[in-house]
Amino acid sequence: MTKPYLTVDNLINEDVGLNVQGLRKVYKSRLALMDFSIFVTKGEVVSLLGPNGAGKTTAFNIIAGMHRSDGGSIKLDGNEISTLPTYRRSKAGLGYLPQESSIFRGLTVEKNIDAILELNIRSPKERRKKLEELLGEFAITHLRNAKALNLSGGERRRVEIARCLASKPKYILLDEPFAGVDPIAIDEIRELVRELKNRKIGILITDHNVRETLKIVDRAYIINDGKIIMSGTPDYVINDQNVRRVYLGDKFAL
């Protein structure tokens, strides 16, 4: 049996973690987001999906702190972060992995990770310990001296996620994790998402690869014309006739 449509109101007495309520964004005379509300709990994998131009990128950029909204609120474990820049949101526990490569291409894998650790751990001994842990956990120890520009798509994503974890996030925004990677790398990314979930990190994903995304999420939000039109488990949302009409099509199946 599939779960019903879910809203923040259903969980009002629970710790909803990343809680986005009533976002509104206007570009000139065009309303890009209207009453946009979503939530992500700890250890939950959630996707934001919809047609091109539906408002996914706008919403994601606002949540990440790259753009300001014209209304609404963003809270992280009860703390208001709506006005904080991206780096302050990172320190508060909200990590962000953009679609574009976020690693320093001219540096080695080891130096890429250590650059983030230096911002968060003062003790050289503790930094070295954490560096070795991250290299081992993401199976990139053998790549420690490799330049980032020589990495494959899957290897690059592992390094980027290891870098992200160096700042100890509670929640992570994943922008197009399946874009531009081969089938083997897709399997690796699925495994990485499972690992993050096992660490009780909440994850919000947006991606054009709908099928692969829905295979790994606990819940999905569907946005169209700047509004959330449906949310729930993958099985629930893909069987909604309105979602099929505006986004998935009649023949879509997982």
Residue spans of the language-model regions?
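Helix-to-loop junction immediately C-terminal to a conserved catalytic motif
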Residues: A64
